């Protein structure tokens, strides 16, 4: 009955939107098949109006893969059940999902890029504390999956890039990179998850992806380091983005 109710609402919305307009769908509002989830171009982080203060539990099938590197890498993103699933988007240093990703809703500022309240190395950007790595309480991996997990640093992303072969491929309908260790041959898959745009829109799914590191871009603290990739580009060296943006997170553990 609940599913029918949501479908009726959804159909009434769709009927009032022209084919040229962008329709933002609350991702969990209806029960979608895996194929529908893959083909749907737009995702919101969680249903509009839903209170979101519960941890995002790690699915039982998620494992830590030993690639012969300094850390082990999870098989899935936070919020994902399978490696090809998108999972959820987070602003840097925030541990909960939300609907809108803009400076005005960012936890660690007072509404703008020059009013940072934490993780700041420049007085022109806010209150200086010289913190450059996320504390555990602000690490979405640790706070949602447990203390044995955390977000990777920018150096760990660089190690992943430099020590593995990256092959653009498609897994169960999702484009992304199969990343295979040159040390022991083990592999993981990073899906092309897109990224948030203009606050609550997600774009470039199956084309591009951004994954947060736990490392601040100390030269300008309104940014943090990320892994960014597309089919013909893999960026981590000096790749950074605005902290308020919603990107995915791939946890690591010892």
Can you name each region flagged by the protein language model?
Residues 4-13:
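Sec-dependent N-terminal signal peptides
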Residues 12-16, 29, 201:
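Detector for intrinsically disordered, low-structure N-terminal pre-sequences
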Residues 5-6, 24, 83:
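Generic early N-terminus positional signal peaking at residue ~5-7
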Residues 1-4, 20:
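Positively charged n-region of N-terminal signal peptides that target proteins for export
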Residues 46-254:
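Conserved positions within compact, well-structured domain cores
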Residues 18-60:
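Sec-dependent signal peptide cleavage junction
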């Amino acid at each position: 009955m609940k599913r029918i109710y949501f479908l009726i609402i959804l159909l009434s919305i769709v009927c009032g939107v022209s084919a040229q307009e962008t329709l933002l769908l609350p991702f969990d509002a209806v029960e979608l098949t895996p194929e529908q989830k893959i083909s749907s171009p737009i995702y919101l982080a969680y249903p509009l109006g839903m209170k979101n203060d519960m941890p995002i539990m790690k699915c039982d099938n998620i494992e830590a893969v030993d690639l012969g590197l300094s850390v082990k890498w999870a098989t899935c993103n936070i919020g994902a059940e399978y490696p090809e699933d998108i999972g959820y988007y987070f602003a840097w240093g925030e541990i909960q999902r939300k609907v809108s990703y803009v400076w005005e809703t960012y936890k660690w500022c007072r509404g703008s890029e020059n009013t940072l309240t934490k993780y700041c190395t420049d007085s022109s950007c806010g209150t200086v504390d010289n913190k450059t790595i996320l504390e555990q309480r602000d690490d979405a991996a640790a706070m949602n999956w447990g203390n044995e997990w955390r977000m990777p640093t920018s150096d760990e992303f660089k190690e992943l890039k430099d020590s593995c072969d990256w092959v653009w491929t498609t897994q169960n309908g999702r484009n992304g990179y199969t990343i295979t260790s040159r040390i022991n041959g083990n592999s993981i898959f990073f899906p092309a998850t897109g990224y948030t745009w203009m606050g609550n829109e997600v774009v470039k799914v199956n084309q591009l992806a951004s994954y947060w590191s736990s490392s601040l871009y100390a030269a300008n603290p309104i940014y943090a380091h990320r892994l960014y990739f597309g089919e013909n580009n893999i960026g981590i060296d000096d790749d950074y983005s605005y902290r308020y943006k919603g990107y995915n997170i791939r946890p690591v553990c010892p």
